[in-house]
Every structure is written in C-alpha cells, then in structure tokens.
Amino acid sequence: MKFAGTSLWRLVFGALVWVGLQSVAMAEVRGIDWLELIPPEELKEMESQPIVDHNGTPIAPDYSNSHPVLTMNGVEGRIPGYIVPITVTEENTISEFFVVPYFGACIHVPPPPPNQIIYVKPEKPIEMTEIWAAYWIEGKLKLENQANSLGQSSYSMELTSVTPWEG
C-alpha cells in the first residue's frame, strides 16, 4: 500500500508542477509604454515645452542628448510601434530595424530622441508584408547605443517575436 501511495503522490506532484509550468507559459507578457523609456526629469522638461506655433519660425528642442532609463535594462516585455527597416536582404526580408513610437519617425527630420528608438537585429531576418502597419515587438530590452543615417537609439532588444498590433 505504501508503494501505491508514493506513486499517487508522485503523480499528483507531477501534475501540479505541469499545471504550474503551463500557467507561467500562458502568463501575460509585460507591456512596455514608450514613456517608460524616458527619465522622469526629461519627460517633465518635454511636457513643459510651449505649444508649437506652426505659423511662426519653429525651433525644435534638441533631444539628441536624451538618456535611457537604467532600470529598463533587462526588462522583458512587448511594446507597440512601427518598424523602420535599416537592412533589407535580397529575399526582401528585414535583418536590422528600428522600432519607433509613431508612423514616419526617422524618415522625417529630426528623428525621435534616442530613448524613443529601439534597435533590433533578429537572429533570422523577418518578413514584412505591411510596412505601414503597427506591430507588437516582444523581447528583452538592453541599454545599447546604435546609430546610422536614420537615427540613433539608446535601447536595443533581443527579439522574441513580431506580431501585428491589434488595439
């Protein structure tokens, strides 16, 4: 009888472990907001800027010296954004790209501040069917500067997945 009880206990324990692992696997991925990537003091400064007068001579503030939020290093999650291709392969896949918070960023001058651009170099190039669409970019954030002719980023991401955004 003792053998049967031990086997039953092992079976129940194994089932509980399996259920626990399934719950972890199905857990909601942490959402990352673009404002989380801006240090509070810089965000406060940005919010205190006057409304732009489009009829006058606009002088855009220079945010090129923006800083990353150090506590975001190593955060795993997903962020919505637009993909700006940096390198496109012969197969028409993207092997390097920036993720930006709004459509047209990096194409227009000036680009967003570096702490509002995430550099991604996936292990395998990704296929893009809708370059104008928003996507969920999921992975692990790292503090890492990358610069090229399209812009400069303060963050990079170890990519887990890219999926179409559904709001």
Regions found by a protein language model. Give the residues of each.
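OB-fold and OB-like single-stranded nucleic-acid-recognition modules
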Residues: 27-167
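Bacterial N-terminal signal peptides that target proteins for export
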Residues: 2-12
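Sec/Tat signal peptide C-region and signal peptidase I cleavage site
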Residues: 21-27
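Hydrophobic helical h-region of N-terminal Sec-dependent signal peptides
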Residues: 13-18
